[in-house]
Amino acid sequence: ESYGWAGKILRVNLTTGEIITQDDEKYHKYIGGMGMAYRIMYEEAPMELDPYDEKALVIFGVGPLTGAGVPCSGRMNVTFRSTWSKGHSIIDAHMGGHIGSMLKYAGYDGIVVSGISEKPVYLRIEDGEVSLEDATEIWGKGTFAANKWMVEQNGREFETASIGPAGENLVDYSTLNTSFGNSGGAGLGAAMGNKKLKGLAIRGTGSVKVADPKKVLELSNYMMGNLIGGNNNHNVPAQPQSWAEYSATSGKNRWSGAPGRMWKKAPGGPVDTGEQPYNDINKVALRCFKGYFDFGAPAAEYTVKNGGCSSCPIRCYTEYDVDP
């Protein structure tokens, strides 16, 4: 019995519209979305293949820990032939948000996309139901508008990712964006734009089976308290805290949570971010007061809470309420 893995991948041919499901057990020994994708590339995408060729692949992949609740395991890997780098080497773009975990909850470890669509489309996945949907209405729109439209069309339970006009026009360093992150450079946006693939909308209601849930919880708590929570020269508070040996001499970094720094519009009343001792795993998420790092004290007046990517305690995003 396989643990961690969902056990199958999707293959989507945009030229023909064919969508099939494939068992992926033979890729498990390569561990993770990147390893699986590189093996598929090795088998199916010759080095001389141009990134804009119809046979060029774009592979979305997640690993066995994705969706299992292990800290910092929620990212999705996207492997393709770079439109940016010299020689169009095979490259990876990693992205956060919640879409990687949602892909696993939908029952898939990856999506292998080939072909070129005649018209703009997006890939819709809802558990076992997979379809290519018309994206003509959002072709030409930016990523915020496109992601918003896909959510409105499908429901708030869906996680979405979209390219923008840069990708559509084959800008060779364009990206794919979700609500909580982006794919970085190397031209994933252009690779998808060439295929007329505007984006993804995914909803999954499944779960990830692990061999020993108790051990996974122990490992996760160790990572939270001893590794992520550990105080060292690469991870120190912006302001002195009573438990911490060091703090940032500049007084300014993303670890800006500190006594007196508030989320003043938090539901139920203001929340003082306070101190975050290394061994209190319930306070790790209070550390990264990104709004305070960006805008200083005025940010606290409008902060609702910190947000972030799936399974990540670092919480890089600040949610604001700017209504009077």
What is each model feature region?
Residues 1-94, 98-324:
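Intrinsically disordered, low-complexity segments enriched in small residues
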